[in-house]
Each structure stands twice: as C-alpha cells, then as structure tokens.
Regions:
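Alpha-helical scaffold/interaction cores of sigma-54-like transcription cofactors
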Residues: 1-496
Length: 496
C-alpha cells in the first residue's frame, strides 16, 4: 500500500506508466553508466531495496523533483555541495546526481537515510553558494507558479534569559537587578540518573529551580519584585516571542496537492531592502505532519570561496577544475594535512585540528573523515585513542565480521553506520530494526535498549557466535552508541 504524501505530481515524459516507472528507468540506466556496464551484485541489490522502499512509501515524485532541481542548478552554473547529512547514503540520490559520494564505496547505509518504517517524507538538504537561493526559488516559481511556492515560517521561543529580561521590563525591575538575575542562570544543567553518568538537561527556569542548587538557593533568598520577576519569567518561558523565516525550507505545492497551506506575507530579514515574501503559516514540523514537500536550500559561504578559487585558477592558469574529480589519494594534498597546513580549509582551520592532524599523520581520506567526526561536540575525548590506534598495528577484533566493519577506524566505533552494520551482519537485524536501535542509542532509552540487547544476544547465538563475544560486542556498542556520528554527514563535509 503506497503511503500518500502531499507531493506535486512530476510531469514524466511520454512512454512511462508512472513516476515510479520513470524513476526506475533513470536509476537503472544510471547504474549501468556509473559502473560501465559491470555492475556488482551489491549495487543491484541495493538499488532494488531502495526502489522497493520508494514504491511502498509512494515518494517517487519527491526524488524526481529533487533530480530536476539539482540538475537545473548545476546546468546553470550554481555550485552544489557533494551532499549533506544522511542523504549521501541513498544510492538513488547518487545515481540521480543529487549527491556525489558513491555510498557503497564509503560504507554508507540506505536505511540511515530512509526506510520502510520512516514516518515522514525524506529530508534532503541542498547546499549552494551564497546568493543562489533566490535564483533557485525563482526557478521553482517558474515551474510551479508563484502561488505554489512559499517560504516556511519559524517561531522563536522565549528562553530562560530572554524571559527574565522581558519580565523585568514588564514589571519595571531596575536594569542592574535584571542583570543580577540573568547572571545566576547556569550555562548547563547536569543530572545523574544512576549516580555515575551525568546527562545534560535543557536550561530552563523550571529545571534550574528543580535541579540547580545554586539557583534554587538564590531564588529562596529573593524577595518582592525579584522573586515575582522569576515567577513571571518561568511562565513566560517557552512562549512564542519572535516570528521569522526558516532559513532553508521552501514549500512547493500544485493543484494536485491534497492539502492547502495557509500563507501570510512576512519580511525577509536576510535581505537588505527587507522585501516581503510569502510564507506558510505552518512551521516546518507541522508542514511535515501534512506530508508537505519541503526543498531545503542552504547557502554555504565555503562553496562561494571554492567557486572563487576555481575562477582564479582558470584566470591565472587557464585550467578548468572539476572538484568532483580531484583524486582523494593525492600525495601532496595528504602531506598538507599531515603537516597541519590547513589554513583556510573548511572544517579543519583551527589550532586544535592542526595539533591532531600532525599527531595523526593521515595517509588516506578515511583518516581525515574519522578525525572530522571525532572533532564534533561530545566526541573529542576519543581523539587521542584514535591517534594511538592509528600508530599501533596490534588492534584486536572480536571476529572477522567486526574487523571488516571497523578496520578503517582501527577497531573503534565512530559512526552510527558501523553500529547498524554490526547489528545486521552479526545478529541479522533488518534494515529498519537497525535504524530503530540507532535511534534508541541516541536517546539513551535504557528500557527499550535492554530488550534489543536480549534480541541481539539470542540472534547472535543463533548465528553461531559465543555468548561472551556477543556480549563484548554489545558492550562496545553501548559504550560508544550515544557519541557516534553519522558517517554520511562526515564524508559529505570532508568532500566539500
């Protein structure tokens, strides 16, 4: 049964029965072309799986719209990034030219992006050079009509500090007292559930009063207007304070759309002349609930710099550079990273990264990708272990399956996709089950993870593994599961 989304119908060429039929034709032809008519079975099976998902979810039109959109951008000289987030893991995206890395080559997984259990329409972000978003919106208006293209409204909500400032103004609290109140709001709130691990909580006034000892004591010392200000602020907190535009989401509809979206005119604060534009009154969350097609266009200044470099090379050296064809094993480039010569390189231009690179001495693209992933918030404490393992050839693996999955990160679990692959290859979890477990690790859902733990042990033993090995593997996943990063995101960013 096809899931119905609010997707405008894609106008397919004559000779095809449906948008799915056309998508199937495009991707199968592209697969033959990409592999020069020598397609490996893993690619054939991967495409078959993804097409089954598309057919069941009823979203062929969605991918065709993105195919047309990205193709038009590239044909009109707009620099588009290799990909963003998990969309690089979808083989269909690569075959249609929406993303650039071959997901099979980089061990990326389809189900990390989209699978049969996904509740909503896929999410693809397109990164482009500065100034290109307006051109792309105009292209969409040409295709669908101005009445069917709009921006998405966004709501800013009062946080703890803003609530206190607004309550202070309303109650006439002196500025110096207001400043004192805001200074007592902690930067973070950590709560321990088991007496060992501290988990961060959102910094709200209510959480401060409940969990932060210093703020609670300060509140109890307050009297009169100060205490009233905190009380009012706690009620004001979380209320809508600012209405603006979502920076990337563009809503498209047509006469075939099942739902209409209420719209309004709003100032686009990103434009110097403050022009008004049409925006849906549903925010992103509610638009997605109704199955809206949102095309995300993010302007990236790094792409503008890259395009300028390409133009300068052509001007001064007469060379036409295609950055998608630059070899990733170029010795001179790798030596620059090894020596910490990374000034001006997106994602890597920092003193901390320079120190790590000179210690790591990367000799392949995978090393650079892994270090980028480990540089993300919450993972930097693993960098030293990764560097040590890189230079120690005695890494031990539980078995050959985990060796195949973890060898390019020297036995460390760094990526979400590695956990998902372990679940599939060792315990025969389905693609949908692996994505579910991945989400549970991210949410630290102990109760549900305990159920999955038992399932992993039982299925692993059924596959012939000793219980001690299965337990060790689960323990390693549980230890790193809350910190791991999306590999598709890391690969895409490092290719930019």
């Amino acid at each position: 049964i096809e899931q119905s989304f609010n997707v405008p119908i894609f106008q397919i060429p004559e000779g095809y029965e449906s948008s799915f039929d056309y998508l199937k034709h495009l991707t199968e032809c592209a697969l033959l072309n990409r592999y020069d008519n020598n397609v490996p079975s893993i690619a054939t099976e991967r495409l078959s799986y993804e097409l089954d998902v598309v057919k069941e979810k009823g979203c062929a039109d969605f991918f065709l719209h993105y195919f047309e959109f990205v193709s038009w951008a590239k044909e009109n000289g707009i620099l588009v990034s290799p990909g963003r987030a998990s969309s690089a893991g979808w083989l269909i995206n690569w075959l249609l030219g929406i993303t650039e890395p071959n997901p099979i080559d980089y061990h990326l997984l389809s189900e990390r992006f989209y699978n049969k259990d996904s509740a909503r329409i896929p999410d693809i972000d397109i990164e482009v050079e500065n100034g290109a978003q307006k051109r792309l919106i105009e292209h969409l208006e040409d295709r669908f009509g101005k009445d069917n293209v709009s921006r998405i409204i966004s709501f800013g909500y009062y946080g703890a500090e803003t609530s206190i400032k607004n309550a202070s103004r309303a109650l006439g609290l002196p500025i110096e007292d207001m400043v004192k109140l805001t200074k007592h709001i902690p930067e973070k709130i950590l709560v321990s559930e088991d007496g060992l691990n501290q988990l961060p909580l959102k910094v709200t006034i209510k959480n401060c009063l409940k969990y932060d000892v210093d703020f609670k004591q300060f509140y109890n010392r307050c009297r009169g207007q100060k205490k009233q200000t905190i009380d009012v602020a706690s009620e004001l907190e979380g209320k809508t304070g600012v209405i603006g535009l979502h920076r990337s989401a563009i809503l498209i509809t047509d006469d075939t759309s099942k739902y209409s979206f209420p719209k309004m005119k709003i100032y686009d604060e990103s434009l110097t002349d403050r022009l008004t534009c049409v925006a849906s009154q549903y925010d992103r969350h509610n638009s997605e609930i109704y199955g809206a097609v949102l095309i995300d266009v993010v302007e990236d200044p790094d792409l503008s710099q890259i395009k300028q470099c390409i133009a300068l090379i052509k001007e001064h050296h007469g060379l036409n550079i295609d950055i998608s064809k630059i070899p990733l094993d170029d010795i001179e480039t790798l030596n620059m990273f090894r020596n910490g010569e990374i000034e001006g390189i997106p994602q890597f231009d920092s003193q901390e990264m320079k120190t790590w690179l000179t210690a790591l001495k990367p000799d392949c693209f995978e090393d650079i990708t892994a270090l980028y992933a480990l540089s993300r918030p919450g993972m930097t404490d693993l960098v030293s272990e990764f560097i040590r393992r890189k230079h120690n050839s005695n890494t031990a693996y539980e078995d050959e399956v985990t060796r195949a999955i973890l060898s390019d990160t020297y036995g460390m679990i760094i990526y979400q996709e590695q956990i998902m692959s372990i679940l599939q290859d060792i315990a025969r979890f389905s693609p949908e089950e692996t994505d579910h477990v991945r989400r549970l690790f991210g949410k630290k859902a102990k109760g549900e993870l305990a159920e999955q733990h038992l399932k992993f042990i039982d299925r692993g033993i059924e596959q012939g593994y000793a219980r001690v090995i299965i337990e060790n593997i689960w323990e390693a996943m549980e230890l790193k599961g809350t910190k791991v990063f999306c590999r598709a995101y890391a690969v895409s960013r490092c290719l930019t």
